Amino acid sequence: VIPARRAVVLGLVQGPAELLPVSSSAHIVLVPWLAGWDWEGVDPEVRKSFEVALHTGAAAALLIGQRHLIAEELRAFDLRGAVVLALSFLPAAVVGYKFERPIERHLGGPRATAYGLLAGAAAMLVADTRPQLRGRGEAGAADGLALGVAQAAALAPGVSRNGITLAAARWRRFSRDQANLLSRTIALPIIVGATALKGTRLARRGASPELRRSVAIGVAASFASTLASQRLIKLVERDRALWPYAAYRAALAAAVLARLRRGD
């Protein structure tokens, strides 16, 4: 069972980490480890379900906070957009459904998470050197597939769905503001799908009242912290390079690997 106070802490961390390309999943893995919590003692299925629930709380906050932008995007939605959305969803859905549990078992620890942070940082640095030639309404099937592969890669903790999809869009030569818009647009189907899958699995095995309470507290904290952190989106949306976020990720990964080497 996840204690209520820890559920609150992780929910509060989720909001800012969700809105910046720094990997919220890495922070949900590393905060308990750095704080010395017995996080490894929690059932992996429960840990992942809790993490997905935090994403759901953040997504709900974004739906409210960004409702005007979402409404504008829906009005402009067409067949081409539907193809991009479908292709961006399918690779991650298939990989997640087939390999989610092995990923949780083998890539859910601090070391693998640190490597994920480094890999995502490298991808962001390389992609952000690409020219900004493409803008609104220019995304096609190949772009959707590239974003889908990126979202599948983001199933590994530390890679960051936000960061790697920004990198994929920038690699496809989209402008920074359009890359941000694409990254946010394709997020919702993945979050809804993951919530449905985890919710179904958790319902089948049964969830104790204590676990349901912890999940509800975490979701509420994630919702509140995301809603309060909406202005962080502006930091990424401005015409700025991704290197500050890549540098933060690399520094965090280095700190984790150094601590692991010391055996702390």
Which stretches of residues belong to each language-model region?
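Multi-pass membrane proteins that catalyze or facilitate reactions on polyprenyl-/lipid-phosphate substrates
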Residues: 1-264
